[in-house]
């Protein structure tokens, strides 16, 4: 007599399943994306999800890490490749206009939109910490440029960093509300006009975000 096989784990491609989970959280947010939603879009059973990723919160944590390494990595690249805060943040905002409106994935930034109406304190706190870490990186780079003379001595680094973070977060919400790439690019250019004129170094008098720009204090690994 042959025994019937039971409980055999379903075979699936883990990276593909993780990508599908990313799309679900990005589109609908953490709170409103249920485990049943996740198993449906990932094409796996609930036991397979728990075995491979843990619970919903640990899956989301992995999604956020992967997002920071992929879709959200443009901010870190700008800070790693540009010589000044002005050009790094200007580039980051321009690239956000492209990334946030890319039709290949949900609009806006996952780390911003996924936190809306989130009632899970640990998730909300983690996303807030990541966003604030980005602003701290902006401020550190701005302060370096003030010290080097790239920006005027009376530049309010804290306020300018907060302003830049607010613009980035606002661009994400604008994209979610239907703003197109040209509108967000115009917003980015306008935001850079608020920066003080360049100090004693190269690019004197320029308010364009297209100049040189960045530093080791980068938002890389936290996403933009």
Regions found by a protein language model. Give the residues of each.
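N-terminal intrinsically disordered/low-complexity leader segments
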Residues: 1-12, 155, 199-224
């Amino acid at each position: 007599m042959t025994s019937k096989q039971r409980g055999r784990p379903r075979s699936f491609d883990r990276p593909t399943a993780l990508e599908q989970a990313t799309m679900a959280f990005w589109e609908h947010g953490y709170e409103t994306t249920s485990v049943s939603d996740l198993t449906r879009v990932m094409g796996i059973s609930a036991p397979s999800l728990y075995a491979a990723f843990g619970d919903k919160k640990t899956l989301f944590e992995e999604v956020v890490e992967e997002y920071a390494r992929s879709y959200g990595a443009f901010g870190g690249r700008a800070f790693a490749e540009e010589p000044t805060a002005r050009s790094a943040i200007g580039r980051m905002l321009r690239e956000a206009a492209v990334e946030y409106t890319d039709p290949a994935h949900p609009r806006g930034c996952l780390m911003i939109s996924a936190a809306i109406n989130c009632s899970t304190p640990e998730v909300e706190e983690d996303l807030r910490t990541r966003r604030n870490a980005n602003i701290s990186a902006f401020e550190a780079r701005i302060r370096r440029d003030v010290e080097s003379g790239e920006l005027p001595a009376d530049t309010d680094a804290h306020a300018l960093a907060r302003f830049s973070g607010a613009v980035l977060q606002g661009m994400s919400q604008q994209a979610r509300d239907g703003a197109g790439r040209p509108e967000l690019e115009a917003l980015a250019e306008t935001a850079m006009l608020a920066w003080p004129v360049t100090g004693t170094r190269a690019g004197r008098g320029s308010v364009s975000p297209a100049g040189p720009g960045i530093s080791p204090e980068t938002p890389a690994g936290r996403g933009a």
